[in-house]
Curated annotation (Swiss-Prot):
Name listed for the protein in its UniProt record: Peroxiredoxin Asp f3
Active-site residue numbers: C61
Keyword Transport: no
Quaternary structure note: Homodimer; disulfide-linked, upon oxidation.
Thioredoxin domain sequence ranges: 4-158
Molecular function as annotated in GO: IgE binding; protein homodimerization activity; thioredoxin peroxidase activity
Provenance organism: Aspergillus fumigatus (strain ATCC MYA-4609 / CBS 101355 / FGSC A1100 / Af293) (Neosartorya fumigata)
Length: 168
């Protein structure tokens, strides 16, 4: 498959690895237990922003991409978005720690792992190194309403929170 586009259905059986945030595991050094997060099922009746990036704790991702979504979360929620999720090829432990490092609690933003970039590869949006590329999807009750892939690893425009907000 060569990407997703507006009007497509979100694929079935998309499962990510995820460690849900919990208060007793809120410290960055505390380890939770990864679960299989069936995005296809969980998001079937929700409005969702899924944004992907090349890796946790990397410069553009940590300095700009995730902080912008955190900052714009109230505006995003005001537009009726139920779920905001960030996706990278890193394992669930790294993604969980990254969420904690960004002081994200509860389910404000889900920090999901795309093991071996399976999902990103399946839609043609993984790089030659096997990492997730930088992209954004808006999914509304199982239908893609916005899909954008950045032209380069360090480019941040089409998948930014500011741009995605304009497409809600």
């Amino acid at each position: 498959m060569s990407g997703l586009k507006a009007g497509d259905s979100f694929p079935s059986d998309v499962v990510f690895s995820y460690i849900p945030w919990s208060e007793d595991k809120g410290e960055i050094t505390a380890c939770g237990i990864p679960i299989n997060y069936n995005a296809s099922k969980e998001w079937a009746d929700k409005k969702v922003i899924l944004f992907a990036l090349p890796g946790a704790f990397t410069p553009v991702c940590s300095a700009r991409h995730v902080p912008e979504y955190i900052e714009k979360l109230p505006e995003i929620r005001a537009k009726g978005v139920d779920v905001v999720a960030v996706l990278a090829y890193n394992d669930a432990y790294v993604m969980s720690a990254w969420g904690k490092a960004n002081q994200v609690t509860g389910d404000d933003i889900l920090f999901l792992s795309d093991p071996d970039a399976r999902f990103s590869k399946s839609i043609g949006w993984a790089d030659e190194e096997g990492r997730t590329k930088r992209y954004a999807l808006v999914i509304d009750h199982g239908k893609i309403t916005y899909a954008a892939l950045e032209p380069a690893k360090n480019h941040l425009e089409f998948s930014s929170a500011e741009t995605v907000l304009k497409h809600l």
